[in-house]
Amino acid sequence: MKKSFSYNNMLKKNNIFLIGPMGAGKSTIGRQLANQLNMEFFDSDQEIETRTGANISWVFDVEGEERFRDREEKIIDELTKKQGIILATGGGSVKSHITRNNLSDRGFVVYLETTIEKQLIRTQHDKRRPLLRSSSASGNTRDLLQVLAKERNPLYEEIADIRISTDEQNVRVVVNKIIILRKKSSL
């Protein structure tokens, strides 16, 4: 996790960026957090869908993961330049070093953690997640989630200002923890 808190870090704290694996609750928590703090909410996946006029799965299938990640990187770069926003990112967005730098440099980064068991429960009926669609068809969703966790968890940890588990806590509790820990970090 990041340790240094300079004057620039103090200025960037008016943005909150939520990172973590699929099913961690980034979008749900982000909306509630934005509502409570009276800030504008963005979801990078929804932005991609709005701008392309297609759902994430279609974009992923037609353009491929590499092109999807390029598009995601550009959208996150644009959104993180705004001030006073909450941004829920896609689980794989941290694969881009440019995105990691932008998130880290331009906002307070919250790593929402969850176990693979909770991910399986929370995403079992979600047909919009391209990586899960292909794995569930072959019956190895758990294996895929383990591979993704091994690849991505160190990247989440690298840029996180704080980490919060969403496994056994309701949305309101997580939102309040984020608000409290954000205030403490800016002191």
UniProtKB/Swiss-Prot annotation:
GO-annotated biological processes: amino acid biosynthetic process; aromatic amino acid family biosynthetic process; chorismate biosynthetic process
Keyword annotations of the record: Amino-acid biosynthesis, Aromatic amino acid biosynthesis, ATP-binding, Cytoplasm, Kinase, Magnesium, Metal-binding, Nucleotide-binding, Transferase
Domain of life of the organism encoding this protein: Bacteria
Details of cofactor binding: Binds 1 Mg(2+) ion per subunit.
Molecular function terms from GO: ATP binding; ATP hydrolysis activity; magnesium ion binding; shikimate kinase activity
Record's subunit section: Monomer.
Functional note: Catalyzes the specific phosphorylation of the 3-hydroxyl group of shikimic acid using ATP as a cosubstrate.
Name of the molecule in the record: Shikimate kinase
Organism: Blochmanniella pennsylvanica (strain BPEN)
